[in-house]
A protein has these predicted regions:
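Extended ligand-binding regions for polar small-molecule ligands
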Residues: 9, 80-88, 148, 162-163, ...
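A ligand-binding cleft/hinge motif common to bilobed small-molecule-binding domains
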Residues: 102, 117-128, 175-178, 205-245
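Bilobed "Venus flytrap"/periplasmic-binding protein-like clamshell domains
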Residues: 43, 47-50, 71-87, 119, ...
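Acidic, polar ligand-binding/catalytic clefts
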Residues: 87, 92-158, 237-243
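Alpha-to-beta junction loops
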Residues: 91-92, 108-117, 162-164, 200-213, ...
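C-terminal motif of bacterial Sec signal peptides marking the signal peptidase cleavage site
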Residues: 3-7
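Bacterial lipoprotein signal-peptidase II cleavage site
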Residues: 8-24
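Extracytoplasmic small-molecule ligand-binding "clamshell" domains
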Residues: 20, 29-118
């Protein structure tokens, strides 16, 4: 169980005194508590990032209560993965809602035991937290309207000059969109739903995201279509290392918490890419259309 069952404020950053104290304690050789001594795994997510995670008003399709948002329930691929981890280890699952920018600080300070929220296993994040997994492999794609002139694009060169956005603090916004020649990059979206709404309302011509988010989008918005350039010369260009970091989706835990990391890995290591894809397809099939 985490030290506190509330989301960190968005103003808190990785270099806050609390985070520094936690990091220095681990560096000094002090034992890091697993967080699950009481049999409860407290897991944070946005609860607004379908099909990875979303909020709904009841427990249908296996949704679980959100402990810090009474009357609300979380569901999605991340919830399904968290339930498998808890079932295998004999833990009770406690879900906490947090905004995206507070997820890493929340793990660092012990506010949550783990984050299962569609996080890419980037080198920058790995300096702040430890990762178990991966628990999904997510291709980077673009999404546009089916009737858009960009719908026939076969590579990023065909997106030149278009207006676009992506979610804040992601490789999609920071590294992908700038590769498109003449792109009119708009303000980053705070959440995945806000990113999708920018496209749906024609505020932008296209967005950049990962394949599961895109697949969930076209389920909710049939007028959208996916542009998948992966494996072609027209794809976004990264080093193999950077691409692997941002395709691999992992579970973050406090630095030095090897007990919890190993317990999570013991479950994820038994699952194949086909298992992950089947579970993701299940999540997409039950996501609310409003997401």
């Amino acid at each position: 169980m985490a030290l506190a069952l509330c989301a960190c404020g968005s103003a808190q950053t990785a270099d806050t005194p609390a985070a520094d104290a936690s990091a220095s304690g681990a560096a000094a050789g002090g034992a890091v508590a697993s967080g699950v001594e009481d049999g409860v795994l407290t897991v944070a997510m946005e609860c607004a990032y379908a099909p990875y995670n979303w909020t709904q008003t009841d427990d249908s399709n296996g949704a679980v209560p959100i402990s810090n948002v009474p009357g609300s329930y979380a569901n999605g691929y991340d919830v399904m993965i968290a339930k498998k981890i808890c079932e295998a280890n004999g833990w009770e699952l406690e879900r906490v809602q947090s905004d995206w920018d507070s997820l890493v600080p929340g793990v660092q300070t012990g506010t949550f035991d783990a984050v299962i929220a569609g996080q890419s296993m980037t080198a920058e994040r790995a300096e702040q937290v430890d990762f178990a997994g991966p628990y999904f492999y997510a291709t980077i794609v673009c999404v546009t309207k089916a009737n858009s002139p960009y719908a026939s694009a076969t590579g990023i060169a065909d997106l030149a000059g278009g207006s676009c956005t992506a979610q804040i603090a992601t490789i999609w916004y920071d590294q992908c969109l700038p590769q498109i020649e003449g792109a009119k990059i708009q303000t980053a979206a705070e959440t995945a739903p806000a990113m999708l709404m920018a496209l749906e309302t024609d505020s932008v011509d296209f967005i950049c995201t990962d394949m599961p988010t895109a697949q969930g989008a076209v389920e909710a918005y049939p007028d959208m279509t996916i542009l998948d350039f992966s494996g072609t010369d027209g794809d976004f260009q990264f080093s193999d290392e950077v691409r692997a970091e941002n395709v691999n989706i992992g579970v973050s835990v406090m630095k030095g918490n090897t007990v919890l990391k190993d317990a999570i890995d013991s479950v994820l290591s038994t699952m194949t890419a086909d298992d992950f894809n089947a579970l993701m397809a299940q999540a997409i099939s039950v996501q609310p259309l409003s997401e």
